[in-house]
Curated annotation (Swiss-Prot):
Part of the 50S ribosomal subunit. Keywords: Ribonucleoprotein, Ribosomal protein, RNA-binding, rRNA-binding. This is Large ribosomal subunit protein uL6. NCBIfam families: L6_bact.
Length: 177
């Protein structure tokens, strides 16, 4: 069984945590986030350390304590350091550029694809075939990256498409006569 909840969350300098009832809010240099803590989880703040425990001994409560601990740890990391994801465009003529909060993608369709970035997510294009997404919310960042990748997922024969920078695309051999 996982023991994630046993590890306390260290609060770096510059991060403030407010715990009011079951609502926990975290503020830092990169923004503010809030979370509604499950009723079966007890959160205790001592100095710069947050500890999590299940209120009862039920298996589901222990699991929820670990889940809440991971969510809060991601919030603390997000508001202090932030998260980033890199995407690569592989294919002839595939390119991208950022105009304001709109990502313009040319992915081999008969029309360009315009993706409006949600609030809190920023995009940079170091080259025409790379996208760097930055956000303080890990879940939102992953969702945005998955939506962009879904426009043209990498295909297994030539590897063309939008892929994560660390993604390994399994290649297939073409059918031979």
């Amino acid at each position: 069984m996982s023991r994630v909840a046993n590890n306390p969350v260290q609060l770096p300098s510059g991060v403030q945590v407010d715990l009011k009832g079951s609502d926990l809010s975290v503020k830092g240099s990169k923004g503010a986030m809030s979370l509604s803590v499950h009723s079966s989880v007890a959160v205790v703040q001592e100095d710069n350390v947050l500890t999590f425990a299940a209120k009862d001994g039920a298996k589901s409560s222990k699991a929820m304590a670990g889940t809440v601990r991971s969510l809060v740890n991601n919030m603390v990391t997000g508001v202090s350091v932030g998260f980033e994801k890199k995407l690569q465009l592989v294919g002839v003529g595939y390119r991208t550029k950022v105009t304001g909060n709109v990502l313009n993608l040319t992915l081999g369709f008969s029309h360009p694809v315009d993706y409006v970035l949600p609030e809190g997510v920023t995009a940079e294009t170091p080259t025409q075939t790379e996208i760097v997404l930055k956000c303080s919310d890990k879940q939102l960042l992953g969702q945005v990256a998955a939506e962009i990748r879904a426009f043209r997922p990498p295909e297994p024969y030539k590897g063309k498409g939008v892929r994560y920078a660390d993604e390994n695309v399994r290649r297939k051999e073409a059918k031979k006569k």
